[in-house]
């Protein structure tokens, strides 16, 4: 069976039998049509317990890539935190108790929705409650979502938070869209807006809920809400404690850096804060206390390949680069021996419906170069289905799928020419459901299954009831390497 192998992850493309508002079905996709006819294929589960999330919870890129790269189901922080709240372990957390004892005033910051991708509203409320019951003066700083949930669902979430704060006697201090607070592409002007707001230097309003409704009236949805503060809020003090409740790291790193790093030079800051506590490890360089430490994941796909002395290439554009490196490698940043990483810059546009092809063709070129060079294993992510799906623009999402289809055709052709095996799958769905029955835009991920195609010597059928955690062993089987005991079985 021994062959070199390409693993292609088509982010945000799932299987939805309903063809209405389904960008995948609506797209012209000759490469996919050929794959369905000629290559063994099946469906994989990418949500709920199949990827270590609560039942019914949609999958996401972080979880999906961890599952694919580690070859096992890792119970995600979302599940771990839920359990810690249920059994009262969270309030006993040593790092939390230290912060509450040290700081009279405490600020809770995070994405407030039930999307479950970066955070959960229930975690936010649990933290407010713990801090308030401890006797601290507590300030809530809500980041509005509109991306992992409906674009105007914020009104209900923020109403819920406002009432919760009032009943608890805590301050509802600021509101800011994730476009500003959770940038991850070093667009520091956006993060600065959030920073200024936390310091009490933003536009002041008497009622945050009314401001949100006014934003909707001006066609500004949750993701893009401009930073605003309650008129009674006076800003953070340097001695205050700050707790970040997002459990996913990639979109909180920049804000933490702005608030805490002494080396930050991107813009002038009035204050730097030392008493920070994050829900999970956002970046090892921060040296900050955390509530939930990383679980150690050993014998990942990338590690096994590296230890065997084989070469590997990991490539994607900026938006998904962390997923094929850090997350795919089990939450480890460091480069492995014989591992090459190629980062293709994402286009500098406000939202990707402006350029649905994104940088797919450049990413495709990097893969073909890797095949021609003879890399033993290549993993690539095409971001289009997900990133354009998040915009809610149906026509742009169709173009996104068509761009991916073109790239698949080229890579498959190149793989066959050089006798490479290939596996094509997705980490989760998105663009296959762009509107609901009422015509509301759907910008979030789905819970639908995803396609998997396997072209390799001796493979004619894929087993039933498989998931993303069965892919790593499949790659090792193709490469003729021993499958570690920590991994789930192969797809074939």
UniProtKB/Swiss-Prot annotation:
Binding annotation for substrate: 118, 147-148, 178, 184, 248-251, 320
Gene Ontology terms for molecular function: manganese ion binding; phosphoglycerate mutase activity
GO cellular component: cytosol
Pfam family, one: Metalloenzyme
Domain of life: Bacteria
E.C. number: 5.4.2.12
Residues annotated as binding Mn(2+) 2: 11, 61, 427-428
Gene (UniProt): gpmI
Reactions catalysed, as given in the entry: (2R)-2-phosphoglycerate = (2R)-3-phosphoglycerate
GO biological process: one example: glycolytic process
Cofactor note: Binds 2 manganese ions per subunit.
Pathway assignment: Carbohydrate degradation; glycolysis; pyruvate from D-glyceraldehyde 3-phosphate: step 3/5
Cross-referenced SUPFAM superfamilies: 2,3-Bisphosphoglycerate-independent phosphoglycerate mutase, substrate-binding domain, Alkaline phosphatase-like
Active site per database record: 61 (phosphoserine intermediate)
Origin species: Campylobacter jejuni subsp. jejuni serotype O:23/36 (strain 81-176)
Biological classification of the source: Bacteria, Pseudomonadati, Campylobacterota, Epsilonproteobacteria, Campylobacterales
Family membership: Belongs to the BPG-independent phosphoglycerate mutase family.
Entry's transmembrane regions: none
Annotated function: Catalyzes the interconversion of 2-phosphoglycerate and 3-phosphoglycerate.
CDD domains: iPGM (cd16010)
Listed PANTHER family: 2,3-BISPHOSPHOGLYCERATE-INDEPENDENT PHOSPHOGLYCERATE MUTASE
Record key words, sorted: Glycolysis, Isomerase, Manganese, Metal-binding
Annotated residues for binding of Mn(2+) 1: 386, 390, 445
Protein name, per record: 2,3-bisphosphoglycerate-independent phosphoglycerate mutase
Xref: Gene3D superfamilies: Alkaline Phosphatase, subunit A, BPG-independent phosphoglycerate mutase, domain B
Assembly, per entry: Monomer.
Class of the enzyme per the UniProt entry, highest EC level: isomerase
Cofactor field: Mn(2+)
């Amino acid at each position: 069976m021994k062959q070199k192998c390409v693993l292609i992850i088509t982010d945000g493309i799932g299987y939805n039998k309903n063809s209405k508002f389904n960008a995948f079905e609506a797209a012209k996709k000759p490469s996919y049509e050929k794959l369905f006819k000629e290559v063994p294929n099946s469906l994989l589960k990418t949500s709920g317990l199949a990827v270590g999330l609560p039942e019914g919870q949609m999958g996401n890129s972080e979880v999906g890539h961890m599952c694919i790269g580690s070859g096992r189901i890792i119970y995600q922080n979302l599940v771990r935190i839920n359990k810690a709240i249920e059994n009262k372990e969270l309030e006993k957390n040593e790092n939390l108790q230290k912060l509450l004892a040290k700081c009279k005033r405490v600020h809770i910051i995070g994405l407030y929705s039930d999307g479950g991708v970066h955070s959960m509203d229930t975690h936010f409320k649990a933290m407010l409650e713990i801090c308030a019951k401890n006797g601290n003066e507590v300030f809530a700083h809500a980041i509005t979502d509109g991306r992992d949930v409906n674009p105007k669902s914020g009104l209900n979430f923020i109403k819920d938070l406002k009432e919760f704060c009032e009943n608890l006697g805590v301050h509802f201090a600021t509101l800011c869209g994730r476009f500003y607070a959770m940038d991850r592409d070093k667009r520091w002007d956006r993060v600065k807006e959030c920073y200024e707001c936390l310091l009490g230097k933003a536009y002041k309003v008497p009622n945050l809920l009314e401001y949100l409704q006014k934003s909707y009236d001006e066609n500004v949805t949750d993701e893009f809400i401009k930073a605003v503060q309650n008129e009674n809020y006076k800003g953070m003090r340097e001695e205050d404690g700050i707790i970040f409740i997002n459990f996913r790291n990639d979109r909180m790193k920049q804000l933490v850096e702005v608030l805490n790093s002494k080396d930050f030079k991107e813009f002038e800051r009035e204050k730097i804060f030392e008493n920070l506590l994050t829900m999970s490890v956002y970046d090892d360089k921060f040296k900050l206390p955390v509530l939930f430490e990383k679980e150690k994941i050993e014998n990942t796909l990338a590690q096994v390949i590296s230890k065997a002395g084989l070469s590997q290439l990991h490539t994607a554009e900026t938006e998904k680069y962390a997923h094929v490196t850090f997350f795919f490698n089990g939450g480890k940043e460091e480069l492995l021996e014989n591992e090459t990483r190629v980062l293709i810059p994402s286009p500098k546009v406000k939202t990707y419906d402006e350029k649905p092809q994104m940088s797919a063709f450049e990413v495709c070129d990097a893969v073909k170069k890797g095949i021609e060079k003879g890399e033993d294993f290549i993993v690539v992510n095409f971001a289009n289905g997900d990133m354009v799906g998040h915009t809610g623009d149906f026509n742009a999402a169709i173009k996104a799928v068509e761009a991916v289809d073109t790239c698949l055709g080229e890579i498959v052709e190149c793989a066959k020419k050089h006798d490479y095996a290939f596996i094509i799958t997705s980490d989760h769905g998105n663009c296959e459901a762009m509107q609901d029955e009422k015509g509301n835009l759907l910008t979030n991920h789905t819970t639908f299954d995803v396609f998997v195609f396997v072209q390799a010597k001796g493979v004619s059928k894929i087993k039933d009831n498989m998931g993303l955690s069965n892919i790593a062993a499949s790659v090792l089987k193709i490469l003729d390497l021993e499958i570690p005991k920590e991994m789930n079985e192969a797809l074939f």
